[in-house]
Every structure is written in C-alpha cells, then in structure tokens.
C-alpha cells in the first residue's frame, strides 16, 4: 500500500528490454557494467541492479561509497566499481566491503595499499585515464606508464582494470570521441609493449555503445558501461533521430488528486499570484512538489494526463503539492495523474520535460526524490 499519493512507476520489462539493447550492441564476448549511480538515475538502485544482474550484468557502477554500500548489502558477491573519487578516509570501508575503487595517483594508491596490508586483505582498483574530457585521470604519457608500474608493484592492491570516459560521443560528428579512443588505444598499446595488461578495459558509455561499436575503436575493450540508455533515453536528441536501436520508456511520475475544489472568479491559486482565475475554476490538488523532483518552474508550462485527457498544471509548484485545472476534464478525487511518462498515455516524456527546462533527461529523472516510492510493474 502506498504511503503517499504520489510515486514513481518503473516498468521492469522495459529495463530488461533496454539492457538487452545494450547487450546486443556490444561484442558477444564482452561484459556489461550496468551504471546504477544516482539511485539508478532515479529508478531505484536495488531493484534496477537486481533486474540487470538477472539479465547478465557482470559489474555494477556507482559514483559514491554510500551508493556502493547500499548495493553491497543486497548483492554480497557482485563486483561494484565506484567510478567517482574515493577519499583516502574511505580506504577501510572499501576494503572491508570488497568494493573496487577508481584511482589516478600514486599517492592514493600508496594509502590504499597500506590500509589493505594492515587488514591483511587486498583492494581492487581501476586506473582512470584522461583522454580529453579533462576531469579526472592520469595523462596518457610515459610518466604515467612509470607511475602505473609503481602502482602495480604495491602489495595489497589488485590493479584489475583501466578505463577512460568519452565526453562527446553523443554528437553527430564523432571526431572528438574517435580521437579520445585513438589516444586510449595508443596508450594501451604502449602498456602492452611494457607487458602491462589489465583484466578489464572500458571506455564506452551509452553514446559509445549506440554509435561506435561498428568501428575498430573498441578493439581493446571488453567491458561496457551503459547508463542512460538502460532507463529508456538516448544520450542526445540527435542520437534519438539517427539511432537504429529502440529503447523503451521506463519511468513515469504519477500522483493522485487528493482534493478537488471550485474556486470563484478573481482569486489567486498557490504561492506568489502566478495563476489568476478569470472565471470560476475547478482546481485539483496533487500531493507532489519540487522537493519530490517536479521542477517549480513547470507550473503554467505543461499539460498532464488524467484519464487519457490533458489538463494544465497551474500556478507555481509548491514544495510538496501542485495544482491542475480540471474544467472540462472528467476526473474525481483519487484519480491518477501522469506528470511525465510513456508517450502512449498522452503525457510528456521526461525528455520533453528536459527540453522545456533547457536541460537533459538525465537530470529530470535522477533528481526524483527518494521520498517518492518506486512502484515496479
């Protein structure tokens, strides 16, 4: 039974479909690291991970220690890589929970090594290489090769993998992504010349998987990191238009009408006088607000779906509630409202909401609050 009159509905069959879309795009002998950071982009990390592991995911990828620990409590043996930076103070937690850390410095490798030796355990690490995003990672040069040799020589560490991240693979012109892969491949070849090999080599995110798997750029890769595509969205609108792969909608934001009232002409609805009743108006209140992830500025800007009818969202969205105009709409208290979801319901999807807000669907769905229950269908 729902504890609130608002929730996120998650289509698990679509999660499975999208996972296999990723699986079918990569080489048959390669593995998938399902990226489930940010609560699986708002879908719910535990359930999404369960689905992906059932369908054959080999690894899980997160951004933070807390995300990794949440998963470890339910999946005691699954490999979990923390893709983001792990402070030195997290070393013992990483070791005790058999997590895999990303590193890019000899200094941190030394700290992790000492902690592992003290615990009489070992810590798996993946080396991050910066091939052109200029965010985190070692530069792909001779100095880094010498550093990698020193890191590999440290006791207590298992240098399991090496990876980079593509910054612009969702563009129509793939020059930058291909240059990044050219740099990464050249660096891997230099390492091979020094007899330095890694169990896992990865670079492709959703954009790389959807657009760069038919070339030679991925010849060294054996692990792939789908993220946004697992949740039903293409990395860009340009890719949506050109991509042959079909992705299915996963996420719907829903709420129930908790009260309907008739407001007389000449009144303001909600905070700040942002909706004025030019005539007697039927108003429905929903128990859903910006603290749940429904952006405040969507008031007076979108229509929502109620019983296969479209009704305007009016006024400014409040922290915990919002309003719909119900004149001419067949609706009653307790009826379900779709704020965004599958296009077949007549509602906007999260990508359309993102475009309206000049952002991306990653943000629209990953900011859905944990105080919203996830309902899996």
From Swiss-Prot:
Q: Which GO terms describe its cellular component?
A: cytosol
Positions carrying N6-(pyridoxal phosphate)lysine are 37
EC number of the protein: 5.1.1.1
Reaction(s) catalysed (UniProt annotation) = L-alanine = D-alanine
Q: Name one GO biological process term.
A: D-alanine biosynthetic process
First-level EC class:
isomerase
GO molecular function term, any single one: pyridoxal phosphate binding
Q: Which UniProt keywords apply?
A: Isomerase, Pyridoxal phosphate
Question: What cofactor does this chain's UniProt record say it requires?
Answer: pyridoxal 5'-phosphate
Note the SUPFAM superfamilies from the entry: Alanine racemase C-terminal domain-like (SSF50621), PLP-binding barrel (SSF51419)
* Pathway per the UniProt entry: Amino-acid biosynthesis; D-alanine biosynthesis; D-alanine from L-alanine: step 1/1
Which family does the UniProt entry place this protein in? Belongs to the alanine racemase family.
| Role played | Catalyzes the interconversion of L-alanine and D-alanine. May also act on other amino acids.
What's this protein's name? Answer: Alanine racemase
């Amino acid at each position: 039974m729902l504890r609130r009159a608002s929730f996120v509905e998650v289509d698990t069959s679509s999660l499975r479909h999208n996972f296999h879309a990723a699986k079918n795009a990569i080489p048959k002998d390669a593995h998938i690291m399902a990226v489930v950071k940010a609560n699986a982009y708002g879908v719910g990390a535990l359930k999404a991970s369960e689905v992906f592991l059932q369908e054959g995911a080999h690894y899980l990828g997160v951004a933070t220690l807390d995300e990794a620990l949440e998963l470890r409590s339910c999946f005691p043996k699954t490999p979990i890589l923390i893709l983001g930076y792990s402070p030195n103070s997290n070393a013992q937690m990483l070791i005790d929970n058999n997590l895999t850390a990303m590193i890019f410095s000899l200094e941190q490798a030394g700290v992790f090594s000492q902690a592992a030796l003290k615990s009489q355990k070992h810590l798996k690490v993946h080396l991050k290489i910066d091939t052109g995003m200029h965010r985190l990672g070692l530069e792909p040069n001779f100095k880094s090769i010498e550093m990698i040799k020193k890191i590999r020589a440290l006791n207590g560490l298992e240098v399991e993998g090496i990876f980079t991240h593509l910054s612009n693979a969702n563009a129509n012109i793939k020059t930058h992504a291909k240059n990044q892969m050219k740099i990464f491949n050249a660096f891997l070849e230099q390492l091979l010349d020094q007899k330095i090999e890694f169990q896992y080599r990865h670079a492709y995110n959703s954009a790389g998987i959807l657009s760069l798997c038919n070339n030679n750029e991925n010849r060294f890769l054996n692990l792939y990191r789908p993220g946004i595509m697992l949740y039903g969205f293409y990395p860009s609108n340009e890719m949506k238009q050109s991509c042959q792969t079909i992705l299915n909608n996963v996420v719907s934001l829903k709420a129930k009408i908790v009260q309907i009232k008739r407001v007389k002409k000449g009144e303001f609805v909600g905070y700040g006088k942002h909706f004025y009743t030019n005539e007697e108006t039927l108003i429905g209140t929903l128990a859903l607000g910006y603290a749940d992830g429904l952006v405040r500025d969507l008031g007076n800007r979108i229509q929502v779906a109620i019983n296969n009818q479209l009704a305007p969202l009016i006024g400014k969205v409040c922290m915990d509630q919002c309003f719909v105009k119900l004149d001419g709409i067949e609706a009653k208290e307790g009826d379900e409202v779709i704020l965004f979801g599958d296009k077949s319901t007549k509602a906007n999807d999260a990508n359309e909401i993102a475009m309206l807000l000049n952002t991306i669907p990653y943000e629209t769905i990953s900011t859905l609050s944990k105080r919203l229950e996830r309902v899996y269908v």
